[in-house]
Amino acid sequence: GSRRIRATAWYNGERQTVSVGIRIKAGKSPRTMNYRVVNTFPHDKEAYTQGLFYHNGYLIESTGQKGMSTLRRVEIKTGKVVQSVNLDQNYFGEGATLYKDEIYQLTWTSRKGFVYNPQTFSLIRTFEYLTQGWGITTMQDTLIMSDGSNVLYFLEPKSFTELRRVEVCDNNGPVSQLNELEYIQGKVYANIYQTDRIVIINPASGMVEAQVDFSNLLKLSDRHRNIDVFNGIAWDEENQRLFVTGKNWPKLFQVEIF
């Protein structure tokens, strides 16, 4: 990440200060991991997937595009949308997560988010933030948000105030375009926007410890005219299942990383 070093000295009774900015890289390159497909399921090919997480046997999915943004409950095996709420047409839906039996959903440039009842999808309250909203996930009693840069913001859930932030980097420098997030077994998994990569981040240091390339996941025969980028990570902790998909992808994949 970025750091600034400042030196102050006194000369002939005058104080002089010099500062210089430096950029810190990770000490070693990320481990390259592989994946295998465990299961393939249908996915709504008109769902512009922005956020995804597992809850009580279903996937909760946040979709984007103005006039098409939703929060929905999806049956995994069939891809059927069993419950849905539409956002106002002025909002572009983004990431979503569950914290203490409440669903948090971001919007892209409106700097406004929504909190829902996870059973009824009724709106409980709204919240505001100072950046764009991209991805969001839950780490114990903290929310972690991305804004498309290389920064992860750690937020207090009730007030949405910033507790701290880390800059994400690897051995080559900053890793930006952090998009959808999922907290899995002590690490933050992040989609890198406009790529088929997921990076695995140490949330304390911001260092990218590993990465997975999913370039060949979606077959050419499944790529229709409105297909968009790889995005969406969901983790079923109880059954140790990892799900990934993409925007307007016709399929959802259960994968294993090794």
Report each predicted region and the residues it spans.
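Exposed beta-strand face motif in extracellular beta-rich ectodomains
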Residues: 1-5
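A short helix->beta-strand "capping" segment at the edge of beta-propeller domains
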Residues: 25-46, 76-82
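A short beta-strand motif characteristic of beta-propeller blades
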Residues: 36-42, 80-87, 121-127, 164-173, ...
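Beta-strand-rich domains and repeat architectures in extracellular enzymes and scaffolds
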Residues: 38-72, 84-97, 134-135, 246-252
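Beta-rich, blade/repeat-based domains predominating
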Residues: 45-56, 89-99, 129-142, 172-186, ...
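Conserved beta-strand positions in repeat-built beta-propeller and related beta-rich domains
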Residues: 61-66, 104-110, 145-149, 190-194, ...
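Short loop/turn segments that connect beta-strands within beta-propeller blades
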Residues: 74-79, 117-121, 157-160, 202-207, ...
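Blade-loop segments of beta-propeller domains
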Residues: 78-133
